Amino acid sequence: PDYSVSFKMTSADSIVTATVKGVTWQLSKHGYLKPVVNIEPVKLSGVTISRTTGFNAKFIADNKIGKGARIKITRSGDVIPHILEVLKPAKAADLPKDKDWEWTESGVDIFVPNAEDIEEFQITRITNFFRVLGVKDVSSGIIGRLYEAGLNSIPKIIKANLRKLQTAEGVKERTASTIRSQIDDAINKCLLSDLMYGSGCFSRELGSTRFASICKALPRVLTM
């Protein structure tokens, strides 16, 4: 009926208390540093959990989440566990120490200026591109090795033959053949919207659905 309201309750058995070990900051394809909260392993809904999303830098800073903090976490289905409540804050928030960073104008996130100059950023962006295209066996580890072998851009990897792929450490003929086959298959099947979204060259506010809508409305967008 029109007056009905759908809502989901969090049951007590899907909530646990955990101790924070620290915060890992992952560099996104847009140069933002996103927090992952590492915790002492706990059982939650029959699964051992050792980390949870930290949402954003403001959440970490405002709640002083760092080593020793006590938090309540929950998990629903296959969704990444998240923090419900901070029971005991740390002495100080665990903000990034290994990179120079700045706050965004909104004061919610932090980002790395000139992230394009950082190898970690380039590997993340390349990995994301192939993940969006559905290339299953091109992990960040593989991309890292290809990068070190001089295949340090998306075009270079797409164009690389078997011999070139095998110049990467640990990439033997069978692995190279699998990578080459999967990339060829993905490129032949992908849509323009997938390429645009996966490239990471556009605003982070533009998602896959928005790109699909743009390409549908403007099928010749690349030649305009």
Model-based region annotation:
Residues 1-196, 205, 213-214, 220-223:
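RNA/tRNA-interacting regions in translation and RNA-turnover enzymes
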